[in-house]
């Protein structure tokens, strides 16, 4: 069985967000090693210390390069990461500190690629020229005036190197000449962080920085010219410009705008990428850059020497040559060092000045208003990798597990303290209170079992992921396994099992007469047994079959036996009663289906609706009761239709729907504990709270109930408005009678009451929170309905024309109100269409419960259609003489209201869940029925404990004083030992007598205190679980989860080890990549 299926089968719905994200970790593994090591489709990380010196590798001998490759770098200093991406057109100039440009592999027609990494450079040097071992010439800039001159420069380069191997005595002059030539190159302005360089005269030349081995290989086709896109993205970076260049440009020409596509800020373990798009604000970029500037003094000082030297060499500002020629004389080395130092002092900045220069250039970039026009957006993204995601997932599971264990332990201690409280209080020692304590032990035992299953399932998932990752990277996998084994969820001695064992024995001691076997049977999970589930399933299936049969019979009798031409006299009222009674039945049935989906999808609807968590509930049971009422409704309707075909019974037909409504009301309000009495009472309480608005606080269940009442009012209001407002003179007699009800003042008032209750709730919420959105925004939605209802009444009462001013106003209010209601449904209640600029998932939310987004788009479309259903009815009314009071038409219209209310509540609960996942997965305490008395008892107990501690302290002080007196007397006795023996014996006997008299009050005092605290003797009846210091039941043991400093240090060191090994492994994987090999010339 796959772990994915195992996780879905055993997951606890309201803990769904706390489990291991197995699919996410698997996707990271597949994404990180997709087709590796044969392609570079994904972005990888390499060491800056190695890639940045790629162009100066010729300064070192082959032996030195080999030693560096084996050691993994030039030195052991921290490294800066740059991103490798093969989508660009040409190799880039890595700019340290701020912009780490992309180093790319540019494939030519013959497959030639550029090289990155010392290992391939080492092999290529051996292939090209075995005589380069003694070379010490500095790197020359290969200046490509056009693509045809590349091979000439390469040949001249090798000729020069071969000549230098034969003439060792003139190395010093060559070094000086090369330094002077490189110093002259400092006047060049690097215009693009890729490969576009500007000459002093402002002309653009396509140049390649570095050695011939970083350019296209010998024998390959000429290098193509820069693409128009690259030329368009030319920039003048002040970070790559010396002070001399800046002075010249201030005199001669203006600085060009800076266009940055990507800034990578490296903060050791945190790699932050700043991406600029066409939209955004300058403040975001300034904020991000300032945040990075603050980290420079901490991180860059360690890297400044190496990176700045490499940067200066890479940009043409050469500090000097590192000569590794073993055959050179010591005098030549000294001369070279002196000359190099002189050149460095004259032409370059020291490390501190270089650091100050770079920070000042950052500020210059931020303060340049013209350049900021091209950097209008800045978003921070964190690069994803497996090791970081794995550590985050482990920490999430571990912290949640330990937190819930400690919460459960606190509840167990509280329940144990209730036992002596109830044993001494006869008035509160009722069956209900005793059952509360017993149920509390059972709930905590079941909760601990769930925690243990949660731990085992997550550990199994982590092991599965590590086994998969071990095939790709054994080093990092072993480090991650060490980190997992050091967490608290991986401990062998589980405190959860110990606490479960203690709860079981306490339950056996106080509730089953020390019968542990009986306690085990009673304390097990309280879920419905298989027999009850099978009974529910059988009943549901039977009721569904009965409903289908009765529904078919109703349709058949209505078409063939119902008198359509001469219906009963009271048929409009009868059909209205049937429709009104059907709406709450269908809403209750749909709620049972919604609760089933919520439970399966992990939405904690129990907490959102504020149901009591200690009550047993099942969506199947709700569905069963809903189907029972549906069956009764279909029976009554079938009886009415069948009886209407007989003329003798038509006079009494109105009694059938009336009796059915009365029976339904009686069942709903009857006080006996049958037919889900807790749910029925909960509904009645919420209806009372809705009616009491705005004088009572409003919670989410009250909002839910007001929506249910709104669906009834919306139904009555829409039907009467559409049928009666227009073409009143052309209505049939039955329709006129139907519309006359709307002209009665009481009916519009009744229709407006649900809207008024909803407005009152919104204003109450605004009074409590002072938030205009979403409370006043939601109230406006109901205000539109009230205004339309008032205009409807006025139009029926005073206007007889088709298009009077009042009717036009009514029509306009309905159109505007429908659009606004749709917007409020989406934005206020479902959380859609919000934050266009910052929400990447617009028009949806960022957090969604269901992964298939088409579900939400279907819901949006359906809500829009249902909000404009009145317009469809209006079109039918104006375009035909179809009777809109037809029972079948009104029945289907009522179904649309049920669909709207069901869909609205379903996604409203889903939005409420995802917007506050931490709140709705929190630990909820069941209220104590005797909380006030118990709190008073605990307060008195704390006071007695404090008095007892004070007494014990005073007694200890008295004992210490007595002991000091005895010691003083003993010293006197030893000092007077020269006297006669009789005196000595007398003093000693008197001291012993005094000592005995001083100790007896302490013993008496202890006995007195024990008698004085005899009222606490009931606490000692469970002395095997008592804490001798506090008097509370003790659940502490040596086996417990700790958050000490040693544990945190171990975790921190393991995280550092994972990060260090990951950087080395990534470097080795990239440097050994086949796509990075240099093709032979």
Swiss-Prot record:
PROSITE patterns assigned to the protein according to its UniProt record, in alphabetical order: EXS (PS51380), SPX (PS51382)
One GO biological process term: phosphate ion transport
Positions with biased composition (Basic and acidic residues): 319-336, 1013-1022
Positions with biased composition (Polar residues): 977-1003
Transmembrane segments: 536-556, 573-593, 622-642, 654-674, 703-723, 776-796, 803-823, 854-874, 887-907
Disulfide linkage: none
Biased composition (Acidic residues): 244-264
Membrane topology, record value: Multi-pass membrane protein
Basic residues composition bias: residue spans: 942-951
GO cellular component: plasma membrane
Record carries keyword Transmembrane: yes
Pfam families: EXS, SPX
Region (Disordered): 86-118, 160-271, 318-354, 939-1031
GO molecular function: inositol hexakisphosphate binding; phosphate transmembrane transporter activity
SPX domain: residues covered: 1-483
Family annotation (InterPro entries): EXS_C (IPR004342), SPX_dom (IPR004331)
Subcellular location(s) per record: Membrane
Predominant subcellular localization, coarse grouping: membrane
Keywords, ordered alphabetically: Membrane, Transmembrane, Transmembrane helix
Domain EXS: 738-940
Family according to the record: Belongs to the SYG1 (TC 2.A.94) family.
Protein name: SPX and EXS domain-containing protein 4
């Amino acid at each position: 069985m796959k772990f994915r299926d195992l996780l879905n089968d055993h997951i606890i719905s309201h803990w769904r967000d706390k489990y291991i994200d197995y699919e996410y970790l698997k996707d990271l593994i597949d994404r990180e090693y997709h087709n590796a090591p044969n392609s570079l489709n994904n972005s990888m990380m390499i060491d800056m210390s190695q890639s940045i010196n790629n162009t100066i590798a010729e300064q070192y001998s082959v032996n030195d390069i080999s030693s560096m490759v084996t050691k993994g770098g030039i030195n052991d200093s921290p490294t800066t990461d740059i991103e490798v991406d093969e989508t660009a057109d040409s190799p880039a100039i890595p700019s340290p500190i701020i912009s780490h440009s992309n180093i790319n592999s540019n494939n030519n027609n013959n497959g030639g690629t550029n090289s990155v990494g010392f290992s391939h450079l080492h092999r290529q040097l051996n292939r090209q020229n075995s005589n380069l071992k003694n070379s010490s010439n500095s790197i020359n800039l290969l200046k490509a005036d056009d693509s045809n001159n590349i091979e000439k420069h390469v040949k001249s380069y090798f000729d020069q190197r071969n000549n230098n191997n034969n003439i060792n005595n003139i190395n010093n002059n060559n070094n000086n000449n090369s330094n002077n030539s490189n110093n002259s190159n400092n006047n060049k302005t690097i215009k693009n962080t890729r490969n576009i360089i500007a000459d002093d005269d402002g002309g653009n030349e396509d140049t390649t920085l570095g050695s011939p081995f970083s350019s296209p290989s010998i024998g390959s086709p000429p290098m193509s010219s820069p693409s128009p896109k690259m030329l368009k993205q030319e920039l003048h970076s002040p970070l790559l410009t010396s002070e001399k260049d800046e002075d010249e440009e201030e005199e001669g020409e203006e600085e060009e705008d800076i266009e940055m596509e990507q800034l990578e800020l490296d903060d050791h373990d945190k790699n932050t990428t700043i991406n600029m798009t066409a939209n955004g604000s300058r403040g975001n970029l300034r904020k991000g850059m300032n945040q990075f500037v603050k980290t420079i003094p901490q991180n860059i000082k360690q890297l400044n020497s190496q990176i700045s030297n490499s940067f200066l060499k890479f940009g043409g500002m050469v500090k000097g040559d590192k000569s590794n020629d073993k055959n050179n004389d010591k005098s030549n080395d000294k001369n070279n060092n002196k000359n190099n130092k002189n050149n460095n002092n004259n032409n370059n900045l020291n490390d501190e000045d270089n650091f100050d220069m770079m920070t000042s250039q950052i500020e210059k970039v931020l303060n340049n208003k013209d350049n900021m026009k091209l950097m209008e957006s800045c978003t921070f993204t964190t690069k994803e990798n497996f090791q970081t995601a794995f550590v985050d997932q482990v920490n999430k599971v571990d912290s949640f597990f330990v937190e819930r264990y400690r919460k459960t332990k606190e509840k167990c201690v509280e329940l144990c303290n209730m036992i002596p409280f109830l044993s001494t209080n006869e008035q509160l020692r009722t069956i209900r209170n005793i059952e509360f304590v017993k149920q509390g032990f059972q709930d905590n035992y079941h909760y601990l079992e769930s925690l243990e299953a949660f731990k085992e399932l997550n550990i199994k998932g982590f092991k599965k992921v590590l086994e998969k990752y071990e095939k790709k990277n054994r080093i990092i996998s072993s480090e991650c396994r060490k980190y997992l084994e050091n967490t608290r969820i991986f401990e062998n001695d589980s405190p959860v099992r110990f606490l479960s064992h203690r709860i079981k024995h306490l339950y056996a001691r106080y509730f089953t007469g020390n019968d542990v076997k009986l306690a085990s049977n009673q304390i097990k999970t309280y879920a419905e047994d298989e027999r009850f589930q099978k009974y529910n399933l059988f009943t549901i299936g039977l009721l569904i079959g009965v409903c289908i049969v009765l529904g078919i019979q109703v349709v058949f009798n209505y078409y063939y036996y119902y008198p359509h031409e001469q219906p009963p006299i009271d048929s409009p009222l009868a059909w209205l009663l049937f429709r009104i009674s059907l709406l709450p039945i269908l809403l209750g049935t749909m709620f049972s289906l919604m609760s089933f989906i919520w439970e399966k999808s992990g939405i904690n609807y129990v907490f959102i609706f504020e149901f009591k968590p200690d009550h047993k509930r099942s969506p199947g049971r709700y569905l069963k009761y809903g189907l029972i009422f549906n069956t009764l409704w279909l029976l009554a309707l079938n009886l009415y239709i069948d009886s209407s075909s007989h003329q003798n019974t038509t006079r009494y037909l109105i009694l059938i729907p009336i009796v059915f409504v009365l029976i339904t009301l009686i069942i709903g309000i009857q006080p006996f504990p049958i037919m889900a009495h807790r749910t029925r009472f909960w509904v009645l309480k919420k209806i009372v709270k809705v009616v009491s608005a705005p004088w009572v606080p409003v919670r989410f269940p009250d909002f839910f109930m007001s929506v249910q009442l709104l669906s009834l009012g919306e139904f009555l209001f829409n039907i009467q408005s559409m049928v009666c407002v227009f073409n009143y003179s052309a209505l049939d007699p039955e329709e006129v009678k139907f519309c006359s009800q709307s002209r009665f003042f009481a009916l519009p008032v009744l229709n407006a009451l649900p809207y008024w209750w909803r407005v009152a709730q919104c204003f109450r919420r605004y009074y409590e929170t002072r938030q205009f959105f979403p409370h006043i925004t939601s109230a406006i939605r109901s205000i539109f309905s009230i205004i339309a209802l008032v205009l409807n009444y006025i139009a029926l009462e005073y206007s007889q024309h088709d298009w009077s001013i009042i009717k036009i106003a009514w029509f306009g209010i309905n159109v505007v109100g429908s659009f606004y209601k749709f917007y409020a449904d989406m934005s206020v209640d479902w959380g859609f269409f919000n934050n266009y600029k910052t929400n990447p998932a617009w028009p949806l939310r960022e957090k969604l419960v269901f992964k298939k987004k088409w579900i939400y788009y279907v819901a949006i479309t359906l809500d829009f259609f249902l909000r404009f259903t009145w317009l469809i009815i209006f079109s039918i009314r104006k375009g035909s003489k179809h009777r809109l009071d037809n029972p079948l038409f009104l029945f289907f219209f009522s179904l649309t209201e049920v669909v709207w209310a069901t869909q609205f509540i379903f996604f409203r609960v889903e939005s409420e869940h995802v917007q506050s996942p931490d709140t709705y997965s929190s630990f909820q305490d069941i209220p104590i029925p005797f909380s006030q008395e118990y709190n008073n008892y605990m307060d008195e107990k704390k006071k007695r404990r404090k008095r007892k501690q004070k007494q014990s302290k005073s007694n200890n002080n008295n004992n210490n004083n007595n002991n000091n007196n005895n010691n003083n007397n003993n010293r006197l006795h030893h000092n007077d030992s020269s006297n006669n023996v009789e005196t000595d014996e007398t003093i000693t006997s008197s001291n012993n007598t005094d000592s005995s008299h001083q100790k007896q009050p302490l013993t008496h005092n202890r006995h007195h205190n024990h008698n004085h605290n005899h009222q606490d003797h009931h606490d000692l009846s469970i002395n095997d679980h008592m804490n001798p210091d506090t008097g509370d039941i003790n659940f502490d043991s040596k086996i417990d989860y700790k958050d000490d400093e040693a544990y945190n240090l171990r975790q921190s060191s393991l995280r550092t080890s994972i990060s260090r090994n990951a950087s080395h492994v990534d470097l080795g994987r990239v440097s050994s990549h086949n796509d990075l090999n240099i093709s032979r010339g």
